[in-house]
Amino acid sequence: MELTLHEARVIGCLLEKEITTPEQYPLSLNALTLACNQKTSREPVLDLSEAQVQDALDSLTKKRLISEQSGFGSRVVKYKHRFCNTEFSELQLSPAAVAIVCLLLLRGPQTPGELRTRSNRLHEFKDVIEVEDCIKQLISRTKPILKQLPREPGRRESRYVELFSETSANVVTTSDHTDKPHIPPVAALVEHGALVARVTELEQHVATLTQKFDELIASLT
């Protein structure tokens, strides 16, 4: 399958909310639009209209990756994914694999360390080695769904990208044609690593506050 940026964001949000707020899943168009446009835990940050999200939903429905749910005393149509782990899905993934794929769909290429730090609400990895083992399994599938990117300057780990979206395909193509980067001094690497760790910590705090705000909004609608 090949997903557009908007389609990948929709699938990623549905995977995320199914795990983190199951009581609010499936999602209405309004709730899904809010999830797509979150300012935290999203790279890139988007500003999609409901019409754009609906277009993505319509396209995903044609690809048999989305289903609608209505009724139960409500006129509001809600949406759930058929991306993986349903009776209609060809793709069957472990909870750990779902967490990794979800994060890559929502935030683009990431290192195993970043995936472990950012996955605490999706799946509890005991260490980075467990993340790396799961990544290896996803790469070694008959039809791989992840790819390792060349290591970048200032990073001790390589980043990994999912292979479902056209955006990720562009990242892979660009990386394959990138010249070998200049390696910065050790001091710069240490400073960069500390900065990344601090930013990740702040992202977690903001993500928690955003989630509580989203839950409050959902309870009022």
Curated annotation (Swiss-Prot):
Coiled coil regions, renumbered to chain: none
Superkingdom classification of source: Bacteria
Record SUPFAM superfamilies: Winged helix' DNA-binding domain
Entries under InterPro entries matching the protein: DUF480 (IPR007432), WH-like_DNA-bd_sf (IPR036388), WH_DNA-bd_sf (IPR036390)
Any single Pfam family the record assigns to this protein: DUF480
Sequence similarity: Belongs to the UPF0502 family.
Name of the protein described by the UniProt record: UPF0502 protein Sputcn32_1644
Organism: Shewanella putrefaciens (strain CN-32 / ATCC BAA-453)
